[in-house]
């Protein structure tokens, strides 16, 4: 595939260079020939040649832009240099389809569970409620949950200024 494209590009470049060279030669040759003897010299009018036309005259006129000269080279109308933005020959695999992903739009299939996975609303449980759901509330502040631990309310953190336990050695 690449070899075919490469050779097509090389042929196109070589054919594109040759008619340009012939165009320069044809532009110079009619003006360089002196008029044949017996004809009064005339200034050449625009677009006309001086003297009799060369052999096969009307066919060998200077290249008109956009018109092939003589028999066109083999396959020349098909082998034009690629226009910018248009692929030459078959497009590369996946070529025009590969577009950069639009921001915010997922490319290809969405990830498993994609749009269905919404963040849970605050205060609302997601999915089925746990067994005994509404009854299981976090304990209210100030109310012990279940039986209080042994000696529960008596175990308070030491108040500042009150020493708990024996005083450290070296005290008063």
From Swiss-Prot:
Cysteine pairs bridged by disulfides in the record: none
Keyword Secreted: yes
Start-end of Low complexity biased regions: 57-67
GO cellular component: extracellular region
UniProt keyword Transit peptide present: no
Region annotated Disordered, chain positions: 22-172
Family annotation (InterPro entries): Pro-rich
N-terminal signal peptide: 1-16
SMART domains xrefs: Pro-rich
Chief location bin: secreted
Keywords recorded for this protein, A-Z: Repeat, Secreted, Signal
Top-rank taxon: Eukaryota
Biased composition (Pro residues): 32-44, 68-137, 145-172
Subcellular location: Secreted
Name of this protein: Acidic proline-rich protein PRP25
């Amino acid at each position: 595939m690449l070899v075919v494209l490469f050779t097509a590009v090389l042929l196109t470049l070589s054919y594109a260079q040759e008619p340009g060279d012939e165009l320069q030669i044809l532009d110079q040759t009619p003006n360089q020939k002196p008029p044949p003897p017996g004809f009064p010299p005339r200034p050449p009018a625009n677009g006309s040649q001086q003297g009799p036309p060369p052999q096969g005259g009307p066919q060998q006129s200077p290249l008109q832009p956009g018109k092939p000269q003589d028999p066109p080279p083999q396959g020349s109308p098909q082998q034009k240099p690629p226009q910018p933005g248009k692929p030459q020959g078959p497009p590369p695999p996946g070529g025009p389809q590969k577009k950069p992903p639009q921001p915010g739009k997922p490319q290809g299939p969405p990830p498993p569970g994609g749009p269905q996975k919404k963040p849970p609303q605050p205060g609302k449980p997601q999915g089925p409620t746990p067994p005994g759901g509404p009854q299981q509330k976090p304990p209210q502040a100030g109310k012990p949950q279940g039986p209080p631990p042994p000696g529960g309310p008596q175990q308070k953190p030491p108040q500042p200024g009150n020493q708990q336990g024996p005083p450290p050695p070296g005290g008063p």
